[in-house]
Amino acid sequence: MDKGISFYFGFDVEPELRAKMIKDAGFDCVITNADKKFVWQNGTIESQVKIFKKVGLKLSSLHMSYNAEDLHYFWENCKNGEKLKKNLIKDVKIAKKYGFTCVVVHLFGEYSEIGKQRLEEVLALCEKLNIPLAIENINDQKLFLQVFENIKSDMLKFCYDSGHNNVFDRNFNYLENFKDKLITLHLHDNNGNCDEHTLTKYSGSIDWNKIAKSLAKQNNIKLDYEVFGKNDENVSAEEYLKQTFIQAKNLEKLIEKHKK
């Protein structure tokens, strides 16, 4: 199974060196974004992709560009809602241009007809370009369920975030209820009270055996970790990558166990 990690994993390391460190730690692929506000941190999406190819890292998912406080506008009749739609369309085109597997999307707000129309417009482009839109489980389960209930498209997929599930709605089994829509993962752990994006050894409360049992039913799923190591004290970037890769290998072993 391919194992991936977020290009920015919590340590301020120059992009090309960071990519090499990720590759040297054993990872196969990366998840990243094309958000201009993170250019100072990661470089442009064009420069990132060049670096990934240079060091031999495959592309996994591309995260949408967004500000959390603006997400609700997508469902409202306003200019900001149209802007969010246009930005999402731009991300879909970027994913197609460079070869990302899908675009991961955060949806938040009150479900509405205009929001449905916007999402269907984006999905029409996704169908044309063959780029799936992966809706991530965040802190709005109601909207998540409404979207999948009311919008039908082969390009409407699901990104499972283990940490969000553990904090916001741990009694809801996304992996089983939406197993046919699953296309990508954001794996990380936390204490069950806040979204820490950490590893199990630092603040773990997730039942990884349960997750492995569900993932064993999937084909060709990448084990992508979305972690931010700065929250964990006295660990170098190299050591944190090593620890993350070990956790990924351990999860892979659990998955293989459940496949037997």
Where are these regions (language model features)?
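Short, well-ordered coil/turn segments that N-cap beta-strands
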Residues: 1-3, 26-28, 53-60, 99-101, ...
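N-terminal pre-domain/capping segments
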Residues: 1-90, 96, 153, 242-260
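A cross-domain feature marking catalytic cores of carbohydrate-active enzymes
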Residues: 5-9, 32-36, 61-66, 102-107, ...
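Acidic-and-aromatic substrate-binding clefts and catalytic sites of carbohydrate-active enzymes
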Residues: 7-15, 33-45, 71-72, 109-114, ...
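Active-site acidic/histidine proton-transfer and metal-coordination neighborhood
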Residues: 16, 71-160, 213, 217, ...
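Acidic/histidine-rich catalytic cores of soluble enzymes
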Residues: 30, 62, 120-205
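Charged helix-capping and loop-helix junction motifs
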Residues: 43-48, 81, 85, 115-120, ...
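Alpha-helix-loop-beta-strand connector modules within alpha/beta enzyme cores
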Residues: 48-66, 120-129, 208-213
